[in-house]
C-alpha cells in the first residue's frame, strides 16, 4: 500500500524540481549591479536573517538610488533594507510590505510618496516584483490586483502566479545567461541601495520648476482658432495642463498601508527624495504644489511626513548630484540624503545601534564599490590625484597626453604630480607628447618628447599586453591606452588617465583632465564609466561576496 504512495511522492518531487528548473531558466535574468532599480530586491531580502531589519524603505526609483542602507549602517548603525523599485505604484508598495512583514519586524516603514501620483504603471514594473515574490497568500492577492488593473491582458491568474507559464515562449531567445542563477542566493551586500557613478547636470533650478508648475496650474482653458476656407471659428473648453490631484485609488491604498503598519506595530514615515525636472514633461518632478498636497493629506491621516526636498537642512548641488539631469540622484546626492535621513531617524525614533559581524562584512564590500564610484565621480584634478595616491596605490595607472597637457599646470598641480611619483620637467612639456606607467605606487616608465611616443608592456596576473600612444600638438594630438587590445582612453586634450585594478583584472576609471587650461575640466564618457563600475560591482557580487 505504501509503495504506490511513495512512488507517487517521488514523481511529484521530481516534477516540481523540473518545473522549478525550467522556470528559473525561462524567467528574464536580472542583476542588481546593472543599475536596474527593480531587480534583485525581494530575492536578496528573503536571504536576510529573520527579524533583523529595523527600517524598510519603499517607493520608486528616486528612493531606490537616493537612500543607501549601507550609508545608514556605517554612520548610524541603522539596519535597513531598500525595497524601492522603478515606477513602484502604491499597490505594489502595499503588497511588498505585506510580504516583508512575514519575516521582519521593522520599527519604521519609510514610503517615498512620489508613488501616490503613479496610476498607470505598466505590466513590466509589476512583474519585476511578482516574479520574485514567494508563492503564498500575498502573491495570490497581488496577482489578483494585477489582473484587475490589466483587463486588456489575456493572461490568467495562474499564469501570473507561476512565471514559467508567463515566460514559456522565452525558449526561443535563450542565451548562456539564462542558465545562470536568476536571482541572488545570498544576502545583498548593498541591502537594495543603488550606486550611480556618473554626473549629468540639471538644466534648471527648483525655483524655475515651481514657477513653471504655478503657470501650468493657472492655464486650465484650451482654445482653438480655426480657419476652414472662408469660415473662422473659435472654441474654448476646460483642459488642465497640470494637476496635483491624487487618484482616489492611491489614497485608498495609502490608508491600507497605514492600517497594515498600525496592525503590526510599525511606524509609517512618509518622505520625499528630491527630484527636479520640468513638470509638463516629467510627471515625477517634485513641485512645491505636490508637496503642499501630500503634506495636507498626511496631516489629515495622521501620518508623519518629512519632505527632504523642501524641509531638510541640506543643499543638493543640481550640477553635481544627479546622473540624468535632475530626476535621479547619483552617489554624491544619495550620500547627502542618507546622512540627513539617518540623523532624522535617530532623533525621532528609538532605534537599536548594535554591531553586527555579517553587516560589517557587507559594509566592507560596499565600501570597495563606493571607493570606485567616488573615483569615477571626482571632477577636481587635485582631489583626483590625491585619490590615486591614497586609495589606488595598489592599482596600475596609465597616463597619456594629447595635444597639450602643461599650459594650465600651476605650482600646486606640479607638486601633487610629484607626490604621485612623476619626475619630468613640466615646464618643458608644452604641446609635447607624454606617457607614464605607475604600478603599485612606483613609476615604471615615464617619457616626454616633442615627437610622438609609443610604449608597450605587460600587466596583471595573467601578463596581458598594454599599448600606450601619445602625440602632442605638433604631432597630431592623439592619445591611446589599450589593455589587451581594448581601447580605454578618453582621447581628449590634456592628461588622459586609465586606472586598472590588478587583483580583480578590471579597469575602474577612465578620465581626461584638460590641464591645458587653468580649470582642468574633467572629461568622461558616462556610458563607459557606468560599464566600468558595473563590472566592478559584478565582480564583488559574483566573486568576492561568494567567498
Regions from the PLM with identified roles:
Residues 3-24:
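Hydrophobic membrane-insertion alpha-helices, especially the h-region
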Residues 25-45:
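Alpha-helical transmembrane signal-anchor/signal-peptide segments
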Residues 58, 62-148:
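Membrane-embedded segments
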Residues 58-61, 83-86, 112-114, 271-274, ...:
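Active-site-proximal beta-strand/loop segments in catalytic clefts of secreted hydrolases
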Residues 129-264, 353-373:
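Secreted/periplasmic serine-hydrolase-like ester/acetyl group-modifying domain
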Residues 258-283:
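Active-site segments of SGNH/GDSL-like serine hydrolases
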Residues 284-363:
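C-terminal regions of proteins
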Residues 374-396, 400-547:
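Short acidic-hydrophobic catalytic motif
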Amino acid at each position: 500500500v505504501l509503495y504506490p504512495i511513495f512512488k507517487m511522492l517521488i514523481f511529484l518531487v521530481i516534477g516540481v524540481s523540473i518545473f522549478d528548473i525550467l522556470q528559473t531558466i525561462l524567467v528574464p535574468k536580472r542583476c542588481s549591479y546593472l543599475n536596474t532599480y527593480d531587480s534583485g530586491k525581494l530575492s536578496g531580502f528573503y536571504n536576510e536573517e529573520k527579524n533583523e531589519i529595523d527600517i524598510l524603505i519603499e517607493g520608486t526609483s528616486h528612493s531606490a538610488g537616493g537612500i543607501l542602507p549601507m550609508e545608514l549602517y556605517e554612520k548610524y548603525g541603522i539596519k535597513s533594507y531598500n525595497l524601492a523599485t522603478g515606477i513602484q505604484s502604491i499597490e505594489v508598495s502595499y503588497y511588498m510590505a505585506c510580504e516583508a512583514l512575514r519575516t521582519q519586524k521593522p520599527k519604521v516603514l519609510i514610503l517615498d510618496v512620489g508613488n501616490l501620483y503613479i496610476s498607470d504603471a505598466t505590466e513590466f514594473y509589476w512583474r519585476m516584483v511578482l516574479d520574485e515574490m514567494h508563492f503564498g497568500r500575498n502573491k495570490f492577492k497581488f496577482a489578483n490586483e494585477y489582473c484587475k488593473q490589466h483587463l486588456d491582458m489575456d493572461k490568467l491568474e495562474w499564469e501570473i502566479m507561476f512565471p514559467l507559464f508567463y515566460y514559456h515562449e522565452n525558449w526561443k531567445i535563450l542565451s548562456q545567461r539564462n542558465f545562470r542563477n536568476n536571482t541572488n542566493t545570498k544576502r545583498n551586500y548593498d541591502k537594495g541601495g543603488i550606486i550611480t557613478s556618473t554626473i549629468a547636470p540639471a538644466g534648471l533650478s527648483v525655483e524655475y520648476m515651481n514657477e513653471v508648475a504655478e503657470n501650468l496650474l493657472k492655464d486650465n482653458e484650451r482654445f482653438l482658432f480655426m480657419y476652414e476656407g472662408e469660415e473662422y471659428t473659435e472654441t474654448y473648453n476646460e483642459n488642465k495642463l497640470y494637476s496635483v490631484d491624487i487618484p482616489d485609488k492611491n489614497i485608498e491604498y495609502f490608508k491600507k498601508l497605514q492600517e497594515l503598519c498600525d496592525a503590526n506595530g510599525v511606524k509609517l514615515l512618509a518622505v520625499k527624495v528630491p527630484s527636479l525636472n520640468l513638470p509638463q514633461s516629467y510627471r515625477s518632478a517634485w513641485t512645491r504644489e505636490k508637496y503642499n498636497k501630500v503634506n495636507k493629506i498626511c496631516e489629515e491621516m495622521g501620518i508623519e511626513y518629512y519632505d527632504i526636498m523642501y524641509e531638510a537642512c541640506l543643499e543638493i548641488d543640481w550640477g553635481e548630484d544627479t546622473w540624468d539631469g535632475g530626476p535621479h540622484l547619483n552617489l554624491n546626492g544619495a550620500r547627502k540624503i542618507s546622512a540627513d535621513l539617518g540623523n532624522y531617524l535617530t532623533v525621532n525614533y528609538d532605534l537599536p545601534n548594535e554591531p553586527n559581524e555579517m553587516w560589517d562584512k557587507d559594509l566592507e564590500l560596499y565600501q570597495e564599490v563606493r571607493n570606485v564610484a567616488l573615483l569615477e565621480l571626482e571632477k577636481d584634478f587635485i582631489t583626483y590625484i590625491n585619490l590615486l595616491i591614497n586609495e589606488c596605490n595598489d592599482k596600475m595607472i596609465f597616463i597619456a597626453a594629447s595635444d597639450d597637457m602643461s599650459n594650465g599646470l600651476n605650482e600646486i598641480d606640479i607638486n601633487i604630480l610629484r607626490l604621485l611619483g612623476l619626475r619630468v620637467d613640466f615646464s618643458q612639456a608644452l604641446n609635447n607628447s607624454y606617457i607614464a606607467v605607475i604600478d603599485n605606487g612606483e613609476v615604471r616608465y615615464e617619457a616626454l618628447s616633442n615627437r610622438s611616443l609609443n610604449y608597450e608592456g605587460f600587466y596583471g596576473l595573467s601578463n596581458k599586453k598594454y599599448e600606450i600612444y601619445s602625440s602632442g600638438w605638433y604631432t597630431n594630438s592623439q592619445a591611446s591606452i589599450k589593455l589587451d587590445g581594448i581601447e580605454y582612453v578618453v582621447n581628449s586634450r590634456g592628461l588622459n588617465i586609465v586606472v586598472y585594478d590588478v587583483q580583480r583584472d578590471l579597469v575602474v576609471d577612465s578620465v581626461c583632465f584638460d590641464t591645458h587650461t587653468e580649470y582642468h575640466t574633467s572629461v568622461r564618457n558616462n556610458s563607459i564609466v557606468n560599464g566600468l563600475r558595473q563590472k566592478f560591482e559584478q565582480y564583488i557580487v559574483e566573486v568576492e561576496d561568494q567567498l
